[in-house]
Structures are given as C-alpha cells and as structure tokens.
C-alpha cells in the first residue's frame, strides 16, 4: 500500500521538476526516484478521497511513445488517457492521473517503437495488443503474474483494503497434485492442506482457475498468512485447472456439469483420501470464482446447495447466456441477465452468497447490486461489496480472503 506521507518533501521536489519541465540533475532525479515509493502519490486539495498519482518510465532508447495500461482506467477504449509525456532532452516519460484513494489495480507499461501505427497503439488497451507490456521497475510492491510470463505491477492506494497476505513467502503445509476426470476430461487438481493440528476442523475452499491461483498468485502462502493472522478459520484449498483458455470458456459459466462433478464425485473422493483430517461440514465448504468462474460459483449455490454453504462470486460475467448470444461490450444496465433469472428461479435457501464487483466494471455493477437485492427479497443471505477497481486479480485476491473470513461468523 502506497503511503503518501512517506518523504513528502522529496516527492514534491520531483513533481515540481516534472511540472516545470526542467530537471536540475538527471542522475540525481533517478537516484531520488529509486529511493521512493513509485508511483508518486500526493493528496488532492479539497478532495480527501482522491489522490494524484505520478508514474515514471526511463527510456533507454528513442521511442515514439510510452503507454500506461492501468486496469479499467486507461485500458480498452481509454488508451489516449494512458499516453505518457516525454520531458525534452531527458530520458523521462511521465503521466499523472487523479484516482480514488481506495483504488487497487494492476498495470503495465508499453514502449511504443518509432513508426508504430495508430491502429497498433489503439489495440494496446485490449486483449489483442501486439506490444508487450512490462512491470514497473520502480514499483517496490510485489508484482502480479496472472498468466504466462507477463508480470504486472500493482497500484494499491492508501484507502484500499490491505493485501498483506499476498506479499509473497513460502507455504508450510502439504501440497498434493493429481490428475482427475472432471466434467469428462482429465484435469490437474491441487489440494493444499495447511500445517495445522489434525484435531482442528478443516474447511475447504474450491477454486476454479486453479492454475492461476496456484501457479501465478501464490494462494498457498496467502492462506497460511491469513490463518496465522486469524483473519480466517483453517481451510484447505482445492484448485481445479483449466486445460486451456478455449476449454475454460466451455466449462465455466452457467453450466451444471462441472458443479455436479465437483460436488458429487471430487469432494467426497478428496475427503476420503484424507481420513485423518477432521473435515468441517458444508457450512465451511466454499466455492469461489472470478469472472466466468464467478458464474460457476453462483451455479454451485443453484445446483449443489447441499454441498456448498458459502459461495464467493467476484466480478461475475452477468452477460453470459447458454446460447452465447451476448458479449460484455454489448451488455447494458437495462438488459435482462440470464444469470440472475436462472439463479432466482430456484432461490438457494441455506446458502450464503457473497457478491463482489469492481466499481469500474460498467454495467456489471448495477446487475450485481440488483441480484443482491433480489436474493435478499427471496430470503437468501446475500452480502455485496464494491471494491474500487476493475476486472482484476489485484483486488480479487483480497476479496478471496475477505470472503473466507465470513466463515468466522
């Protein structure tokens, strides 16, 4: 978390030089920048819930431009907002954005070589970008690596929820890996059992997108930290891998086969293979998912209420339909959500539902809020939280620990 009170005079000195367009000594400038928390964060006079955030990039060779891709702030159609400015006769590129003080999001920086077309630059804000982004070398916070080898930096401002459990480290429990037939295909499954006394009741958290949580985000160490900090009760974590991105879209979402296989076959098998453990009952059995996986979590409440006592749905893809006739960019606040209607056609009594969404996720926000209210009206225990951010593992990580914390009650 970036503390704007750290070295305020040094931050002011750098910002004043940038504003004046004159750097007294370039070597001293970069030495000072490397000693500070970058991006540089300063308060906004008269707006206590906002911050001015200054990003820096040091160019090692001539460039046409540098683009800051910040989740749901400068990405997608907002590429122009993320274009940095060069200070003449220096190697400095900079951009200052005014952001909510509670913002948490991932970002990367893209160098734009000379001769790059406007079309290529415009594509840089979306999934079809051809220019490779890099993490911010001046950002001292742990990087995030969601898929592949592309690392991103994380901006967590001072009023955002803390992410201390995700600061890296090693897990101390037992990690078991196996191949299982789930939903008709062989998949890698990871079971993490924390190092706790076998006499303690042990809950179970099931995570689709297991390869992301285990290979890229370090969920095992985070669970250990949260247990040790008494933020959550002891839980094991069961991750179910996708085979590839295409297959992920085939199996996650509103389909029932994955849910029924997990509830009817996988969980009984996993527990039977660990008979020495004191497995907690369904009240501490959790299904948690994000995006398409967020819909799968809701389907856990719909199709397996006897198995899951709590589901955590983060940024659910409320646009999803079985016919695949809808897309995120075409789904508006006034459209009917198949997801909501299907879930409410048989309200999952006895299942606690935690809905979370990023404040910058457009039409998803009102749809999630409406689903929350309708669930309550239907007699379902529903919780709803809005995190300041986008469609992003940066805050989904924290929401996972927050959601598991509901088991304390």
Curated annotation (Swiss-Prot):
It is an enzyme of class 3 (hydrolase). Disulfide bonds: none annotated. It comes from the Bacteria. Pfam families: Enterochelin_N (PF11806), Esterase (PF00756). Keywords: Cytoplasm, Hydrolase. The keyword Hydrolase applies. One of its GO terms (cellular component) is cytoplasm. Belongs to the Fes family. Catalyzes the hydrolysis of both the apo and Fe3(+)-bound forms of enterobactin (Ent), monoglucosyl-C-Ent (MGE), diglucosyl-C-Ent (DGE) and triglucosyl-C-Ent (TGE). Shows higher catalytic efficiencies on Fe3(+)-bound forms. The initial linear trimer products are, in turn, very good substrates for further hydrolytic cleavage by IroD, leading to complete degradation of the trilactone to DHB-Ser and/or Glc-DHB-Ser monomers. Hydrolyzes MGE and DGE regioselectively. May be the ferric MGE/DGE esterase responsible for cytoplasmic iron release. This is Iron(III) salmochelin esterase. It comes from Escherichia coli O6:H1 (strain CFT073 / ATCC 700928 / UPEC).
């Amino acid at each position: 978390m970036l503390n704007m009170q750290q070295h305020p005079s040094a931050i002011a000195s750098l910002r004043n030089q940038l504003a004046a367009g004159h750097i007294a000594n370039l070597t001293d400038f970069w030495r000072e920048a490397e000693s500070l928390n970058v991006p540089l964060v300063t308060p906004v006079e008269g707006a206590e819930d906002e911050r001015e955030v200054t990003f820096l990039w040091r160019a090692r060779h001539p460039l046409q431009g540098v683009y800051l891709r910040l989740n749901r702030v400068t990405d997608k159609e907002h590429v122009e907002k993320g274009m940095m400015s060069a200070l003449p006769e220096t190697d400095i590129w900079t951009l200052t954005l005014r952001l909510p003080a509670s913002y948490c999001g991932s970002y990367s920086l893209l160098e734009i070589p000379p001769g790059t077309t406007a079309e290529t630059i415009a594509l840089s804000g979306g999934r079809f970008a051809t220019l490779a982004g890099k993490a911010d070398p001046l950002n001292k916070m742990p990087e995030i690596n969601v898929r592949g080898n592309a690392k991103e930096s994380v901006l967590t401002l001072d009023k955002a929820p803390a992410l201390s459990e995700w600061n890296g480290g090693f897990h101390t429990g037992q990690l078991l890996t196996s191949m299982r037939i789930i939903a008709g295909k062989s998949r890698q499954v990871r079971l993490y059992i924390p190092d706790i006394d076998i006499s303690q009741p042990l809950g179970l958290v099931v995570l689709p997108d297991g390869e992301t949580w285990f290979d890229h985000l370090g969920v095992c160490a985070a669970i250990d930290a949260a247990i040790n900090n008494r933020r959550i009760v002891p839980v094991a974590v069961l991750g179910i891998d996708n085979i590839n991105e295409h297959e992920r879209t085939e199996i996650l979402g509103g389909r029932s086969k994955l849910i029924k296989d997990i509830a009817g076959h996988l969980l009984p098998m996993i527990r039977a293979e660990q008979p020495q453990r004191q497995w907690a009952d369904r009240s501490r059995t959790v299904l948690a998912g994000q995006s398409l996986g967020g819909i799968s979590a809701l389907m856990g409440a719909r199709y397996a209420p006897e198995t899951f006592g709590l589901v955590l749905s983060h940024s659910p893809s409320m646009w999803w339909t079985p016919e695949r006739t809808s897309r995120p960019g075409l789904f508006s606040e006034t459209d009917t959500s198949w997801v909501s209607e299907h879930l409410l056609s048989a309200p999952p009594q006895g299942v606690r539902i935690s809905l979370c969404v990023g404040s910058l996720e457009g039409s998803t926000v009102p749809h999630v809020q409406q689903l929350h209210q309708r669930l309550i009206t239907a007699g379902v225990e529903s919780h709803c939280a809005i995190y300041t951010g986008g469609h992003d593992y940066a805050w989904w990580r924290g929401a996972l620990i927050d959601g598991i914390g509901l088991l304390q009650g």
